[in-house]
């Protein structure tokens, strides 16, 4: 198996450190998840980005447990994240949801617990359907729940006080929501996770968040590639970034793969990345994106590919107004 040096880490505003390169658990299927997590740990990965909605936390936990049991890694050397799903935003459900996650992962705490989306939906009991996805218990109708974000955030702050989450963060938030949140919170978000790739660079949001000492993690670093298997028309109709001439030219110049260039475009600017791969060689390549530098001309050429093209758009699924 190919191995790579563990990713360097950056310090969060909570004082903890997060690796710049992690392993994403989105779309990691149940039949391979445990083995993939185990292999990733053996390859040098220490950050694992998960979520309640990914429906694989039990298997992820099995892979972690195996690696710890074999002495490959200690729990304190790992950085495990999860995300609060929309159904559990009510303050009485926040701890319940995290306890379910911790039970599935077989862990005492997570290193970072995000709010997955800045919108609350009608809750569904865990025993009825878990994870519920966008199901609200009323056929196919999506229903909003009247829960202010600040109430949800204060419930997350209590999780930190209880030692159930070392740090807390936000995902898919706009600058306006962040502006409002940091003026009413006691514990500041340590991180913002957003869709980020050359077709969607969101430069003003990135600048605003970094000015407030909030770490950014970019998901879907390869743009449409992450959404092709979902048969998403917007992704199918978009040129694949891994084959984009500018990206390929820069990759050839540096003797790297297009995937490594796309990841380095983010990490060189301080943005953490969470790619997923089933191939041991690509897993090692993805982790090895700190050992070369893109020039300013490279960075500018990649940035010029931006066309504000978002693929993860909940409005397309159920008219859910996250980004509209």
UniProtKB/Swiss-Prot annotation:
The active site is at 54 (proton donor). NAD(+) binds at residues 220-286. GO terms for biological process: arabinose catabolic process; cellular response to osmotic stress; cellular response to oxidative stress; D-xylose catabolic process; galactose catabolic process. The keyword NAD applies. Pathway: Carbohydrate metabolism; D-xylose degradation. It catalyses: xylitol + NAD(+) = D-xylose + NADH + H(+); xylitol + NADP(+) = D-xylose + NADPH + H(+). Keywords: Carbohydrate metabolism, NAD, Oxidoreductase, Xylose metabolism. The record marks 83 as: Lowers pKa of active site Tyr. Substrate binds at residue 116. It is an enzyme of class 1 (oxidoreductase). GO terms for molecular function: D-xylose reductase (NADPH) activity; mRNA binding. Its EC number is 1.1.1.307. It comes from the Eukaryota. Reduces D-xylose into xylitol. Preferentially utilizes NADH as a cosubstrate. Belongs to the aldo/keto reductase family. This is NADH-dependent D-xylose reductase. It comes from Candida parapsilosis.
């Amino acid at each position: 198996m190919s191995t790579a040096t563990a990713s360097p880490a950056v310090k969060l505003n909570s004082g903890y450190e997060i690796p710049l390169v992690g392993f994403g658990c989105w779309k990691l299927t149940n039949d391979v998840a445990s083995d993939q997590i185990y292999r990733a740990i053996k390859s040098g990965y220490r950050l694992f980005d998960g979520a309640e909605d990914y429906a694989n936390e039990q298997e992820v936990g099995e892979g972690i447990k195996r690696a710890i049991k074999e002495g490959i890694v200690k729990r304190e050397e790992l950085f495990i994240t999860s995300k609060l799903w929309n159904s559990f935003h009510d303050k009485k459900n926040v701890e319940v949801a995290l306890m379910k996650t911790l039970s599935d992962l077989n862990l005492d705490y997570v290193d970072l617990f995000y709010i997955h989306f800045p919108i609350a939906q009608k809750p569904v009991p865990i025993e009825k359907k878990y994870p519920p996805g966008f199901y609200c218990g009323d056929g196919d109708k999506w229903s909003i729940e009247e829960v202010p974000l600040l109430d949800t955030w204060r419930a997350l702050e209590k999780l930190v006080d209880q030692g159930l989450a070392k740090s807390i963060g936000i995902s898919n938030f706009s600058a306006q929501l962040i502006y409002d949140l940091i003026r009413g919170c006691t514990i500041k978000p340590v991180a913002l996770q957003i869709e980020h790739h050359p077709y969607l660079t969101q430069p003003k949001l990135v600048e605003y968040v970094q000015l407030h000492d909030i770490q950014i993690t970019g998901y879907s670093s390869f743009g449409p590639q992450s959404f092709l298997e979902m048969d998403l028309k917007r992704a199918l109709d978009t040129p694949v970034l891994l084959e984009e001439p500018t990206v390929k030219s820069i990759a050839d110049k540096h003797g790297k793969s297009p995937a490594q260039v796309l990841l380095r475009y983010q990490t060189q600017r301080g943005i953490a990345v969470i790619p997923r791969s089933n191939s041991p060689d690509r897993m090692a390549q993805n982790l090895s994106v700190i050992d070369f530098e893109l020039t300013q001309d490279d960075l500018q050429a990649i940035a010029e590919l931006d066309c504000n093209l978002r693929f993860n758009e909940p409005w397309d699924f159920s008219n859910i107004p996250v980004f509209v």
